Regions:
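Core catalytic region of metal-dependent phosphoesterases/phosphodiesterases
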Residues: 1-53, 172-176
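Active-site neighborhood of phospho(di)ester-bond hydrolases with catalytic His/Asp-centered motifs
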Residues: 1-6, 42-45, 106-110, 135, ...
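A structural motif corresponding to the C-terminal end of an alpha-helix
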Residues: 31-43, 51-52, 97-101, 142-156
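Binuclear metal-dependent phosphoesterase catalytic core
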Residues: 50-53, 146-153, 162-224
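Binuclear metal-dependent hydrolase catalytic cores centered on His/Asp/Glu-rich metal-binding motifs
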Residues: 52-104, 136
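Active-site-proximal beta-strand elements of phosphoester/diester hydrolases
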Residues: 56-71, 106-110, 181-189, 216-220
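A short secondary-structure junction signal
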Residues: 69-75, 117-123, 169
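Active-site-proximal segments of metal-dependent phosphoesterases and phosphodiesterases across multiple
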Residues: 103-153
């Protein structure tokens, strides 16, 4: 699944090329062909059922292309593609998804939820303008609260967008557990970087087993 962000194209073929621009045209064509056959899927306002360790979870892909803050990003495109004309309509779409979800839920989003702090160094706090405040998505925060009100367990919220290193040089937390929900900000920039002995790619790994759920940061070498 690919959750497109605010800097991504809206077309899967272009996004596949964007993700693989350093790998050559053959790689790009292969990714594009796989996307057409279903192995790569753009997600957003979509419900994906996952079975792991004998339990069923609902992976709910929230609003794509979000830039955070109090307004709906790319309103014309969101209306044309998803039928979403406002944050209130987005909220209602997420509510319907929660109603159809299993008892255990993982939210996947581009930007994280509002409510986790309004300082520049907070998980989704605004660091690019004075007094920016909380830059999380209010519709996502509402959906999380609604899921809890329906006695559903929000196991994790996985997002990014707000770079872990702020413009002030502060490091945001990449993981927080609040009210039994694990919040993950995976926006390490650059995600692909040169190390002393290799080129590394930053990932966040989620493991689910009979004892519960764990997260870890993984640096995968390109050549080693």
């Amino acid at each position: 699944l690919v959750m497109p962000g605010n800097n991504d194209t809206f077309e899967i073929d272009q996004l596949a090329a964007e993700l693989n621009h350093q790998q050559g045209v053959n790689k790009i064509l292969a990714i594009t062909q796989r996307s057409e056959s279903g192995s790569i899927k753009l997600c957003g306002y979509s419900h994906h059922r996952v079975s792991a360790a004998g339990r069923e979870l609902s992976l709910l892909a929230a609003r794509p292309h979000s830039m955070g803050g109090p307004t709906l990003t790319f309103p014309e495109y969101m209306a044309e593609t998803y039928g979403i004309n406002s944050l209130e309509e987005s909220q209602q779409r997420l509510r319907n998804m929660v109603d159809e979800a299993s008892q255990d839920i993982i939210f996947l989003a581009h930007n994280g939820p509002a409510g986790l702090g309004d300082s520049p160094g907070d998980m989704w706090g605004c660091d690019f303008k004075p007094g920016g405040g909380d830059w999380g998505d209010t519709d996502l925060a509402w959906a999380i609260g609604y899921a809890r009100s329906r006695q559903k367990r929000v196991r994790a919220v996985i997002a990014g967008h707000m770079h872990l290193k702020t413009k002030q040089g502060e490091q945001r937390p990449w993981q927080q557990v609040i009210d039994d929900t694990c919040y993950i900000n995976a926006a390490r920039v650059p995600r692909i970087f040169n190390g002393d002995d290799d080129v590394y790619r930053h990932h966040v790994m989620l493991r689910i087993d009979a004892t519960g759920m764990t997260f870890s940061e993984e640096l995968l070498p390109q050549y080693g």
